[in-house]
Each structure stands twice: as C-alpha cells, then as structure tokens.
Amino acid sequence: MNIINLGILAHIDAGKTSVTENLLFASGATEKCGCVDNGDTITDSMDIEKRRGITVRASTTSIIWNGVKCNIIDTPGHMDFIAEVERTFKMLDGAVLILSAKEGIQAQTKLLFNTLQKLQIPTIIFINKIDRAGVNLERLYLDIKANLSQDVLFMQNVVDGSVYPVCSQTYIKEEYKEFVCNHDDNILERYLADSEISPADYWNTIIALVAKAKVYPVLHGSAMFNIGINELLDAITSFILPPASVSNRLSSYLYKIEHDPKGHKRSFLKIIDGSLRLRDVVRINDSEKFIKIKNLKTINQGREINVDEVGANDIAIVEDMDDFRIGNYLGAEPCLIQGLSHQHPALKSSVRPDRPEERSKVISALNTLWIEDPSLSFSINSYSDELEISLYGLTQKEIIQTLLEERFSVKVHFDEIKTIYKERPVKKVNKIIQIEVPPNPYWATIGLTLEPLPLGTGLQIESDISYGYLNHSFQNAVFEGIRMSCQSGLHGWEVTDLKVTFTQAEYYSPVSTPADFRQLTPYVFRLALQQSGVDILEPMLYFELQIPQAASSKAITDLQKMMSEIEDISCNNEWCHIKGKVPLNTSKDYASEVSSYTKGLGIFMVKPCGYQITKGGYSDNIRMNEKDKLLFMFQKSMSSK
C-alpha cells in the first residue's frame, strides 16, 4: 500500500480542523464527524484546544482512501505557533492549504504558501466555507492569482453551493488544455504537431506538474455541510505521490513528543527509509548511544495500534524513551526538506508562581513543555534571578499560562511582555586585568580586545595566545567566560555581532587554575564593554502590505509613524502594494489595524529579517538587587589610573 504524509495548513478560523474531521469521517476512520464547537474532535485532543477551538500542537492521524494510506498532520493556524508548523514541513510529501471563501487570503495564508512554494512541496488549495452568505468566488480567484500564484488550476465550478468537476481523467476544458501546454514542453510539442492527446494524457501531465510543485489545483467545499470532501480525498490520493525509497537501511526522524496523562513520554517518528521493528537495537544520531525498541505503535484509520514493524514513509510511535529529543534520528541521518529559516521569538516576559515555594515546580513544568516544544526558550536572569520565557506572541503566553495551571497545577503570573533587544560594541577597545594587582583576587592575567562586526555576524572568538604557553583547559575557560558574558550586556541584553580576541595571559604555576581564568573573564569583558559603549539593536520585520488604493494614504502615514523603511510601492486602480522593513516593537498590532480600516480586505504580512540599530526608545533588561562589589572595585581602580 502506498503511504503519503499530508500537512493540513490554514490561517486561523479557516476551518482546518473541521476539514480534517470530515476527511476522517468520509474515509470511514470515525463513526461520527467531530465538531470544534462541541469539543469532540480527534486531532485537537488537548483540553485547551477543545475549549478554545484552536490547534496548539501538530497532531497526527491516518485514513485510507483509494488504496492509499494518508497520514494527516493537522498543524496550528496561529502565528504564535509557527515553530510547530515549521517542524512539520520537514516530513511532508504534500499539503492542503485551506482558505475561507468568506475571509479570503490572510497574512498567515500567504506566509504558509510562500514557504510551501519555496520548499517545492506539492500543494492542493481548498476553498472552504463556500456556503457562507456574501461569498464572492470570482474576486477570491483574482486574489489567489494576485497574491499566491498564477499557476493555479480551478478544478471545479460552484453552482448553488454544489461543486462540479471541469477537469478530470475523462474530461478537460479547452482552456485548461492551453494551460497544460504552457507548463509542459512535451505536451506543447504534441499539441503543435496535431498529435492526438487524450484527456488522460492531460490529466497525467497535471499530476506530474503538481508533484513538481509547478501547478496548484484548487478545489471547493464546505466542511460544515460535508460538501466537496470526497472530491478533496480523490485529489489528495491523485496528486500527492509517495516518495521513492532509496535504501533498505533504517532512517527515521523524530518530529513530535507528547506526554500522556500518566506522564509516559510518547515519541512520534517518520520512517524515511527501511523499517523499524519491535526489539530492534538502534543508534541515536550516529552517536555511541543505542536503545532497544520495547514497544511499537502506528496509526491506522484514526486509531493507534500495536505492531511488530513500521515501514518506510509511515509513522511510528515509541513510548518511554527518555533519551529522545525532537529532531533526533534513528539509524542513518535522513534526507529532509532543506531551506527552512527558523524564526526565533523576539518577545519575552518574566514569569513567577503565585506561591514562591512552587518555583521549582514551575521550572520542572517548563522543562517538560520544552521537551515537547523546543522553540519554548526559558532561562534564569543572572542579575534578577527571575524566570524569563521567550515568546512569539500574546496567544502563546496565554496558552503556556493555562497549561501550567491545568496540566501541572501551578498558577503563575506573567509580567509585561517586552521586545527582545540586543547589544553590540560601538568601537574597538582593549582591556587587561593583571595578576596580583589589586583588586584582582584571581591567579590570572587576562587581556581581551572587543571590536564590532557587521550586523547579523554573531559572536566570533579568537586567541592570540599560544597553546604551548597556556594549554587548552585554561583557554577554554576563557572562551566559556566570554560566552557567558555575552548573555547580558550593559543593558541586560545579549551582546552580539562582535569579535573577542584573547590577547594577553599570565599565570603562576602551580597555583593558577582554569577556574581563575573563567571567573576573571567576565570582569575583563565588562570593563571593555563599558569602555566601548554599546549600540542597542532591535528586531526588524520584512513586511508586505496590500491595501485598497483608497487606503494607501493612511497606510503610508502609519508606516512613517512606525519608523518603517519603505523599499517599494506599486499601485493600480484598485490595489496598492508596499514592501519594506519595520521595527517589531512599533508594528506588533498593525495586522489587526489593517484588517479593521480596510474592512478585512487588507493584508499585512511580516517575517523576521534580523536586527538593526534602534531608531526609537528601548527598555533595559536589568533588575539588579545589589551591585557586584568586585566589579565596582575594578571600575574604581581603572578610573583612578
């Protein structure tokens, strides 16, 4: 049996989970169709998902249709969970991108489609909610061609809420023959030579074009009234093809981890090549660590079943493997989809338990959530000792807060969400602290040179000290101290885009230790940074704004107020497209503002594009309870020279 892995993607409230539930029901995988409003869906299994009607974690289920097993990955639709969506892209054979016929193309829709297009993932576009009042499909078709792709093939006509095929294996409209000829040289040559071309020839060519992500079929339906679902199933099993297996050697990718109510760890793997068998002893990540498969499940027709073997391109579930982490692979390293640029969160907030004695419980709970979602980054502020969580947005914060309370029984309070800034030295400086020169209490001399690098370069560390003079353990201690120092600069933000050179060293044998060098390094670094001064860097977003021509003046005024850098403006009689860069801090809520002042017609799409020197205000990230006395003494001694 052929097996395919299909992603279901959509903007929030496009009906993604409802479509998935209908696919399960129509294929016979479930006896009734789950409803988001009733909280009885298969894919949204978490209590918080059922209650709020949104998908938080990617979930996997399975159906069989036309002799093809289709593993369906239902992904979050909210931008705050984009990291969860990005992880699923690596394992997809194809995707269904769902649009709402009423709301049309949203910023998230375009972002998802651009990624699918970039990664060349075969994609079917499904227009849901065609039953809604006020739907204008002709305008939506124009929007699809203008904002997604010209290479779309509308497979059906919609008449009075019903769908009728206009392109199939036995029939194809004349204008679609021309479309296929324009996309395939072989068919074009046969057409120009007046050779006979059957509807099946055109159909098979369309299948090949979709498989190469050169053409995107468009279907219609309504999940609420089960319209167009069977046709969508037929399209999925026709257009999304299974990959060819290249080896019999086991290769698998761990894409999801969850914990059941009893705390058992459940790991989901896609078997890329070969097979995984019960009682196999397999290697993790080509390391020296081996594990034995003591239990093995797969998903069949919406249900998990115990099996002895899971074959290529199928999903395996293994329980109670403590060493597993998302991104691990078993066996040979798999060839996965490349080209994803992971988006790092640019917001943060401090979190504290309502009861201070439950702090360790919060840390343990956050660690469990991190195992399930590696994009969840939390740390302890070295100055304030507060727990800090990096965030993608407000919705993610609310979900984390609810999970901590309901799943781990600990109530927490989040402080104000802040933008994550960074720091960079302004100029090249050199600083030395000498051994046995007060107030230096360490048996070490360290000299460091700091110099700024171009934005986006990151941290570079070099050493001018010979390993013949100062061995690896001492120098590694200095490098560790530098990395630790870069975690918090003069304003408490990460220091980046700089080169730090270890320029001078002295030690006394046998009293000097690596610990002396490790502990002295942050003081040398801090004094050098104070001498240099820092530029504050703020996160920037690349934006594309599409609004009706009548709203262009307001849009440009808004962008100027947000201190954006407009790179391109193109307008016609109806629409205006504006591209450029804008600070995240000034544009956090602008997508909803655009939707409001354009009555839902405008689209504000953004993606991270690095950091640049801030033009406006910024906030510090330091909450020092007491001053570092030794640093104060170093500063005083330096100022007296």
UniProtKB/Swiss-Prot annotation:
Location of the tr-type G domain: 1-244
Alphabetized UniProt keyword annotations: Antibiotic resistance, GTP-binding, Nucleotide-binding, Protein biosynthesis
One GO biological process term: ribosome disassembly
Pfam families (alphabetical): EFG_C, EFG_III, EFG_IV, GTP_EFTU
Top-level taxon in the UniProt lineage: Bacteria
Function summary: Abolishes the inhibitory effect of tetracyclin on protein synthesis by a non-covalent modification of the ribosomes.
Protein name, entry field: Tetracycline resistance protein TetQ
Lineage: Bacteria, Pseudomonadati, Bacteroidota, Bacteroidia, Bacteroidales
